[in-house]
Structure formats: C-alpha cells, structure tokens
Amino acid sequence: LEKVSDAALSTATGAGASHVDVRIERTRTGLLSLRDAKPETQSDETNFGIGVRVIVNGAWGFASSPDVSVETAQKLALTAVAMAKTSKPLSTDEISLVPEPVYAKKSWVSAYEIDPFSVTDADKKDRLASLSSKLLAAKGVNHTSAHTMYVKEQKHYADSAGTSTTQQRVRVQTQIEAISTGDHGFESMRTLAQPAGYGWEWMGNSIWNWDAEIEQLPTLLAEKVAAP
C-alpha cells in the first residue's frame, strides 16, 4: 500500500500541490439473518478503494477509484490537482491547514479477541439459531427474526507532511426479535444490545448476556400484548 500512496504523493506534489493526503480503505462486511431459527439471508462482500485529496493554490481537489494500483494513484493525483485548479476561481476562501504532529509508520488495531470472519458460518448460524429456538419454545412467541452484521475496516493513510498510518477495527451488531401474532394483531419485542466494537466474543455471555435477555423477552412481549 505504501508504494501506491507514495506514487500519489510524489505525483501530486510534482504537479504543484502544496498538500496531499491519500486514503486507501478495504471494508469487509458480513451479514447473516435467520427467520424462525432457519437461515434466510447471508452475504459477504468487500469494498476496496483509494481517495486522493490535494490543496493547490489554496483550493481543494479530490479524486477516487475502486482500483488500487500505482498507475491509478498517479492518475488520481493528476485529476485531483486539475480539479483544484478548476475550482480555484469559484473558491471564496483560501484553504490553510493547521499544523499537525507527524506520525510516521504507525499502526493501530482495535481491541478484540475473535475475528468474526474467522468463525465458521455454521457456528454463527448455530448461535443465532440457539437463541431463536429458545424464544420459539416460549408461550406467546409465534415467530422470530435474528440478524447479525460484522465488519472489518482496514485503512491506510499517508500525507505529504510525512504521516503514514494503518489501522484496523472490527465491529459487530446483532438483533434478535420475538414476534406475537393473533387476535391482538402483531406485536414484537427485540434485544437491546447496541452495535459494539468487539469481535465475535460479543456473542458470548461475558460482555452482553444474550441468554439472560432472551429469557426475559417472552414475558416482556406478553406484557406488551396485554397492554391496552
């Protein structure tokens, strides 16, 4: 990645940019949903791209592409410079950046124990199915819906001041819903766990007690159904 960002930096500065920054990002997103404890939808997709931003004569210029290569980085740098020159007559204020500390060759990884993408699809399905089945076995619960989304973001940043960083973070979001249908119509009650900056360990009970919350949902749902 450094070869790609270096190509953009050198090309843009050579074309007259007073400031250049490059961002290369890969985002992998997995999604799994179950209906009544049975698999309904599953996807695993990756987005990859590069963005080049420049300042030329006090004006911003920007260009991006899903193709990450040295050749593309050079083309984007020239496009960004051309855009800055084009937008200069329309700029009402001259851009001036505040000096920032330089972080050369630094890296950061968010704290997590289990990469969700290292967990087998079967294990993920089993966990959601187990929680869903507990709800389905409860009185008054006719259907369940469960879904989890897990994301891994990897970013590389470099600028003409000398900063070059990489970072990786993982997050998981899961929601399980109990549904009641009948003469009363349709009512539902879901888990309250928020999106979290954890790995798949989030789906155990050590951080958020999923099993305990699942045990409470049927009672809460029944109270909601009975409410006037």
State the predicted function of each range.
Residues 1-228:
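Active-site bordering "gate/hinge" segments
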